Design a protein with these regions (language model features):
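Acidic, polar ligand-binding/catalytic clefts
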Residues: 74, 78, 83-147, 213-219
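N-terminal secretory signal peptides and thylakoid transit peptides that target proteins
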Residues: 2-16, 26
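Periplasmic-binding protein-like
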Residues: 51, 127-137, 199, 203-245, ...
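Extended ligand-binding regions for polar small-molecule ligands
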Residues: 67-79, 138, 144-150, 158-159, ...
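Bilobed "Venus flytrap"/periplasmic-binding protein-like clamshell domains
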Residues: 46-54, 63-79, 111, 131-185, ...
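A ligand-binding cleft/hinge motif common to bilobed small-molecule-binding domains
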Residues: 93, 110-118, 164-167, 188-220
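Ligand-binding clefts/hinges and TM-proximal coupling segments of bilobed small-molecule sensing domains
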Residues: 27-32, 160-177, 214, 245-272
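Extracytoplasmic small-molecule ligand-binding "clamshell" domains
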Residues: 30-110, 247-250, 259
Length: 272
């Protein structure tokens, strides 16, 4: 395990997270018999938590990791009746690699075709806006103006918007940082023209750094889902997908977003 990855044992009790566990105890039905063997075959649920997306997870000054993804992992472990281990990583690409390599049982990912090899996805549980940030003096005023020759866009390597822009851009050039949290600082330091990222992260960066602004609107909608190693099979993927649908329908996902003060994300509609 690399220095950027840490593991935390999470005790499942109402004393640990009263609001989460109260919802878990009342809103979402138990999973079918055999679900624990399919989703947590080692007898513990290893959930990979990516800190690269602040809408889903954060670490506080004391080192405690919390967020919507942690709440969902806690709820799933409670429904399975197994202990929870959080495998914490700093970037989306690390999370993908961790689950593909079966070093975690589940993870939280933006759905993208390039990630489907090796990972089985649920339907999305939240929809997140991807946005652009520029310097105040930039001539850019609209998202449609970004994809032009000579425009350099800073992105987090392996992030959902990196994968999306790698497919969609016709003329602009991508520049990459190891993590999404470093995008705006590297954008400023290296003279890029645009920073791309999750709207909430860019809004937080704009609030603390002078001389930058967000372009209005969004350039993409990120579908955030749960996933597991594809080798677990279709039945395990269906169990995880069913859990996600229950969590959305019960109001659990909406309550978690509200509890963590998340803006720029909405609960995804029910899967058809």
């Amino acid at each position: 395990m690399t220095s950027s990855m840490t593991r935390r044992r999470a005790a499942l009790s109402c004393a640990l997270a009263p609001l989460v566990m109260a919802a878990a105890c009342t809103s979402t039905p138990s999973l079918p018999a055999g679900a624990a063997a399919a989703l947590a075959p080692r007898g513990r649920l290893r959930a990979c938590i990516n800190l690269g997306n602040p809408i889903l997870a954060n670490r506080d000054a004391a080192g405690t990791v919390s967020g919507v993804s942690v709440d969902l992992a806690t709820l799933l472990a409670q429904r399975l009746g197994v202990p929870l281990d959080l495998v914490v990583v700093e970037a989306a690409l690390q999370s993908v690699d961790t689950v593909k390599a079966d070093r975690a049982d589940i993870g939280f990912f933006a759905i993208d075709p390039r990630r489907s090899d090796g990972i089985g996805f649920s339907a999305p549980y939240v929809l997140i806006e991807g946005a652009y940030l520029v310097r105040n003096e930039s001539p850019l005023t609209d998202n449609a103006q970004v994809d032009r020759a000579g425009t350099r866009i800073m992105v987090g390597r392996g992030s959902a918007y990196d994968l999306y822009l790698s497919r969609e851009l016709k003329a602009a050039q991508l520049m990459r940082t190891p993590t999404s949290q470093a995008v705006v600082e590297r954008f400023l330091a290296e003279g890029a023209d645009v920073a791309a990222g999750v709207r909430q992260q860019l809004e937080a960066d704009a609030a603390r750094l002078p001389g930058v602004r967000l372009l209005p609107g969004r350039f993409m909608v990120i579908e955030q889902a749960m996933g597991l190693p594809l080798a677990r099979g279709a039945a395990a993927t269906a169990l995880l997908a069913g859990f996600v649908e229950q969590a959305k329908a019960s109001g659990f996902v909406a309550q978690s977003l509200a509890r963590h003060g998340i803006r720029g994300a909405i609960v995804a509609p029910a899967s058809r």
